[in-house]
Amino acid sequence: MKGILSEIGRLNHIAIAVPNIQKASSIWENALGAKISLAQSLPEHGVKVVFIESPNTKVELLEPLNKQSPINKFLERNPNGGMHHMCYEVSNLENATKKQQCQ
């Protein structure tokens, strides 16, 4: 059986947890001239998000909406923020999941 790498496509986005999404967005916009999406609250995930567009991928900034948010727990361990996850595209999610579970 081939490993999980045979299922992985391109990098879709990198997610960075931040304590203040407005401040972090401003840094990306002013320092890099990045195009920033409008902030969206996703209560079902406990976060507010913005996407920073780049030619080959996206960066997702995540700010917790409340103390119960998993991002809040991440920021308790990493008060200045940091990389939370990377998201890769796969051609077949079911196959990729099975291969990952076998490893």
What are these regions (language model features)?
Residues 12-15, 87:
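Residues embedded in well-ordered beta-strands within globular domains across many folds
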Residues 58-84:
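Helix-adjacent hinge/juxtasegments
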Residues 75, 79-103:
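Mid-chain, well-packed structural core segment of small domains
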Residues 1-4:
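N-terminal mitochondrial targeting presequence
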Residues 10-11, 83:
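Intrinsically disordered, low-complexity peptide-like regions
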